[in-house]
Amino acid sequence: VRSRRQRQMCIRDSTVEMLRETVGEVGIDPAILGPVSADVRPKAPGMKYRHYAPKADLTLVEGETEAVVETINRLAGEKLAEGRKVGIICTDETKDRYPAGMLESIGARARQETVAHNLYAVLRDFDDRGAEYIFSEGFSEDNLGRAIMNRLNKAAGYHILKV
C-alpha cells in the first residue's frame, strides 16, 4: 500500500477486501486488471510481464458454465484432431463434462483457497506432460478469485475468450 496518496492504492490484489475493512476505500492498480503498455513502469515484480506461464499456449475461457464447457470441448477437440497435446483446467463441478485431452481439476469453485493453491502445480504438471495447448475455465473475481484470475490472465498472456 502506498500511503502518500490521498487514496490508498493496492498493488497486491488478493488483499483488497481485507484492506478495505481496515483503511476504507482502496484502489486497484491497473496492472492487476489487465495488460499494461510498454512505457508503464511496474510498481512490483510480476505486474507487467507474463510470468509463471506454462510452455503451452494457454487460453482462458470466460462466461456462463454451459457456454464455457461447450467452447473448451470444441477447441480442445479441434486441437486433438490435429494431433496436438491438449490440457484442460476445470473444476470439480465440471470435470465429468470434458471427455477429451489431459484433464486437471483445480478444485471446487466454492473453495477459492484450494483453487489458488493448486494453480501453479497444475500448470507445471501440464508442462511435465508435454501439453501444447491448455484451455482453462474462468473464475469469479470476488475475494481470492481476483488473484486467481490475475494469475491465469498473466499466464495466458491475456489470451481470453469471452463466451
Where are these regions (language model features)?
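A short secondary-structure junction signal
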Residues: 8, 19-20, 72
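Single conserved hydrophobic/aromatic residue that forms the stacking wall/gate
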Residues: 1-11
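Short, flexible loop segments at boundaries between secondary-structure elements
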Residues: 160-163
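Glycine-rich phosphate-binding loop plus the immediately following alpha-helix
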Residues: 13-23
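Accessory alpha-helical/coil subdomains and C-terminal extensions
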Residues: 21-38
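A C-terminal functional module that forms or caps the active site or interfaces directly
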Residues: 40-157
